[in-house]
């Protein structure tokens, strides 16, 4: 396949060439697409049935069960089926409220309302300029204390271990070692209806089409064997290096999950 380690000068032509090669490799593209569409429809119906019955759609895991190692195989399977989870009791309520208060004091102390000029990228362009729901603040004491807590490390290790991170003698990442990932503050006042985030897919689309590592990650998709594709297989994901382009929001870190605390 015509992969590219660096971004080609005419990346649009390169993607067209890749798509032609993939179509030839897959064969009956429509049949594969129809099969996947039917599978997605079945999953959506499953979710709608649960919602109508007032049952839980995404799994909720008490932090205590993670700390004590009592999360069941059924709960782990539910997280992998949904691709997300809610962890409750991660921090005491009093601690969370204290961090929230300290964060507001940090904003006031640094004159946030006077110096804030907008989100700085297109993901949050629809938010209000003053006191937004998502703040471009990364290193406040509240954020750092949460990131560096033992509780956070325990949850990250638990979630990382849901991935298939080692196979054939190769370890793709260490599930018990996480890099502190700085991200914004999200603070939604009661009654907020805005989702705060524009629709987007993290990591570059160019790379998904053209990088050799991504061709390995999605090999079973690109050869039409979608039944063999395991989205929890970390193989080759840590080999992905995004192209050097003028983009302020890119990052080479492999994030096993993304969440809000």
Segments predicted by a language model, with ranges:
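Fe(II)/2-oxoglutarate
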Residues: 1-81
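Non-heme Fe(II) oxygenase catalytic core, chiefly the N-lobe of the double-stranded beta-helix
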Residues: 54, 74, 79-82, 91-261
């Amino acid at each position: 396949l015509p992969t590219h380690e660096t971004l080609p000068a005419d990346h649009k032509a390169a993607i067209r060439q890749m798509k032609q090669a993939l179509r030839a490799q897959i064969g009956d593209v429509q049949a594969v697409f129809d099969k996947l569409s039917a599978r997605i429809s079945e999953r959506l119906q499953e979710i709608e049935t649960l919602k109508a019955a007032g049952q839980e759609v995404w799994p909720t895991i008490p932090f205590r069960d993670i700390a004590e190692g009592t999360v069941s195989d059924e709960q782990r399977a539910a997280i992998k089926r949904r691709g997300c989870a809610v962890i409750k009791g991660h921090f005491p309520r009093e601690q969370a409220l204290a961090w929230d208060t300290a964060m507001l004091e940090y904003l006031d102390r640094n004159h946030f309302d006077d110096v804030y000029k907008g989100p700085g990228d297109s993901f949050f362009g629809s938010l209000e300029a003053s006191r937004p729901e998502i703040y471009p603040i990364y290193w406040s004491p509240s954020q750092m204390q949460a990131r560096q807590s033992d509780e956070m490390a325990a949850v990250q290790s638990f979630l990382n271990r849901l991935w298939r991170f080692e196979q054939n003698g190769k370890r793709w990442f260490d599930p018990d070692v996480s890099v502190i990932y700085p991200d914004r503050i999200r603070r939604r006042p009661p009654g907020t209806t805005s989702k705060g985030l524009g629709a987007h897919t993290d990591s570059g689309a160019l790379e998904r089409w053209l990088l050799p590592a991504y061709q390995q990650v999605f090999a079973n998709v690109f050869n039409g064997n979608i039944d063999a594709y395991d989205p929890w297989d970390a193989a080759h994901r840590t080999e992905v290096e995004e192209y050097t382009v003028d983009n302020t929001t890119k990052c080479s870190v492999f994030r096993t999950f993304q969440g809000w605390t």
